[in-house]
Amino acid sequence: MNMNKIALVYNENSKSSSSIEEIKKLYTYCDVEDADVIMVAGGDGELLHNIHRYMHLNIPFYGVNLGSLGFLMNPLDIKNILQNIQESTASTLNPLLMQAEDVDGQIHKALAINEVSIFRKTNQAAKFRIEVNGVERMSELVADGALVATPAGSSAYNLSAGGHILPLESNMLCLTPICSFRPRRWHGALLPSSASIKFEILNTNKRPVNATADFQEFSNIKSVTIKSTNDKSIKLLFNKNHTLEDRIIKEQFGG
């Protein structure tokens, strides 16, 4: 893969401005639209924002970690950044498409790289019905919320909520309840990536619910349909000795 033209994007208000200045001195960067690869300096959040902003260009992303966890990022190695990009391996991600209908009948669509989540808006637990591929699988779940995570997002909010970590090539989605009250011992489900998942919110007046696709939030939702998109894909580049698959395995052993 030809990766001679590199664009650099970052948060100009970043606390890691000294590291960014060092990275800027390494190379003569080009505009994003002309790039072979987009280098994102920051954390996972910065990478996600830029994926959403530029995914339509079909250009690979290479993340450089200036944040804390940086699960989707590569370690900061200023001296070898350019070489690491040239020798990197690519992982392909398919985002989720969320279609949410609010109580006024408006339809909201958004893409999610990590997860789509629904959660209670007040102090009362949410109640919802779950369908998979048009078949009712749970007539009532009482919980703070629920989420559907991609393999790339399974080690983020999903893991903190008690969900499973999914290998990147598993072609599966993880449906995880958030603080499930009834059924109390239900820990979620692993579903094929081809599944269409629908949450129908029960008692929306008394128990209002919001929905998010990554960082995009929509209020007072009455139903949410989630499915993986095959017509859109994102390529993330990882150092050859620090692949995303390696990180997913390591995370399952407390690494």
Curated annotation (Swiss-Prot):
**What does the record give as the reaction this protein catalyses?**
NAD(+) + ATP = ADP + NADP(+) + H(+)
Cofactor(s) listed in the protein's UniProt record:
a divalent metal cation
One Pfam annotation reads NAD_kinase_C
Q: Which GO terms describe its cellular component?
A: cytoplasm
> Its Enzyme Commission number?
2.7.1.23
Q: Which UniProt keywords apply?
A: ATP-binding, Cytoplasm, Kinase, NAD, NADP, Nucleotide-binding, Transferase
Q: Which GO terms describe its biological process?
A: NAD metabolic process; NADP biosynthetic process
The text of the family note is: Belongs to the NAD kinase family.
The entry's function note states: Involved in the regulation of the intracellular balance of NAD and NADP, and is a key enzyme in the biosynthesis of NADP. Catalyzes specifically the phosphorylation on 2'-hydroxyl of the adenosine moiety of NAD to yield NADP.
The name this protein goes by in its record: NAD kinase
* Organism, scientific name: Rickettsia bellii (strain OSU 85-389)
Species lineage, top-down? Bacteria, Pseudomonadati, Pseudomonadota, Alphaproteobacteria, Rickettsiales
Gene this protein is translated from = nadK
